[in-house]
Amino acid sequence: MLQLNPTPPAPGRWRTILENDFFPKNRRRDIDGLRGLAIALVVLFHAGWLKGGFIGVDVFVVISGYFMGRSALMQHPFQPVRFVCRRLYRLLPALLCMVALVSAGMLWWVLQSDRADIALNGAYALVYLSNIWASGHVGYFQGQAVAYPFLHTWSLSLEMQFYAIIFIMALLLPLTRHRRLVLSAIFSASAAYCAYAWHTGDSQAYYNILDRLWQFALGTMVWMLPRPKLPRAAADAVYAAAVAVIVGAGLFYPLSYACPSWMTVFPCGAVVLIIMLPDTRVGRWCLVPLSPLGVISYSVYLWHWPGIVVANYLLFFQVHGAMMAGVLALVMVVSLLSYVLVERTGLDYENRAPVAARNRGAALLVAACLGLAAVLAYISHVSRVH
């Protein structure tokens, strides 16, 4: 049976987590730092402090494609059950915990009309279809978005949908050259569709996986591209320029540059350059210091938006300034606890459990998500009827 330890880790385990997760010796910490930069951009955007911070999602998407290329398409032989279990233990426990706690804390006191939408959004989030719910209910950059604590899970739904595509590719296409051809086709078709959506002004393209597949595919194809052999000074210069492009986009991009705008090509291309240039001095100076934030970025992403939404509901006005800083500080504490007690515990169990127990645990996680989704869908239905 799956057992998640509810008690705080022993001091020895805290030490192990700090050493192995936050200061690893066998992982590129600059990529963790890039994830830290991306989550900082997103959080500051949602706090109203950075107008182009939405670009952090695009950065995350490319990085996600890169990691999926490594864990699925570049593994020979591909282990489908282990791949699925790893993803489920990585993602479901923290998501389930967040949706359950936020739902329990909000649904009993919000307005009945809000309760119906919030509960349904939570149900869609648990089955990774939140982007589909959002496209039919609210624009991401509209004012009413702040009323939905699970709206941010649209990007997690896109990610899981891409995982499903990669899973099918890894099963059906055993040869790398075939995978390269399919990824190139996906990249080209998605980029063309994205350009079409931008040209026609599709207001819901931001949530559409068809507009994002080229970004996922771009990150995945990094594994299939030759690594540039640049002199140290040239590599540092290119790396610094790439970091500057991402930071500049976060600082100065207007909302009109959000996906499907072609302007997202620049930060996405910058991510590829950073990934392809390991061990640079600029990376150690600029991104490695952000790596601890990158390690807990999933938990930060899960909790930061509900924290802002709940604060707005409780205070009856949109929080800003020092109040927002306090909310984000609390979010960071909750996120760290979520990482250590939930996210990390799930991965530890997946690593150590016997195969049969691991597979049963994954099935239980899926059943728990489906069960809670059914409860939330029922609450939404009852709230609308009455």
Swiss-Prot record:
One of its GO terms (cellular component) is plasma membrane. It is a multi-pass membrane protein. InterPro entries: Acyl_transf_3_dom (IPR002656), Acyltransferase_3 (IPR050879). Its EC number is 2.3.-.-. It is an enzyme of class 2 (transferase). Belongs to the acyltransferase 3 family. This is Putative membrane-bound transacylase BcsY. The gene is bcsY. Pathway: Glycan metabolism; bacterial cellulose biosynthesis. One of its GO terms (biological process) is cellulose biosynthetic process. Keywords: Acyltransferase, Cell inner membrane, Cell membrane, Cellulose biosynthesis, Membrane, Transferase, Transmembrane, Transmembrane helix.
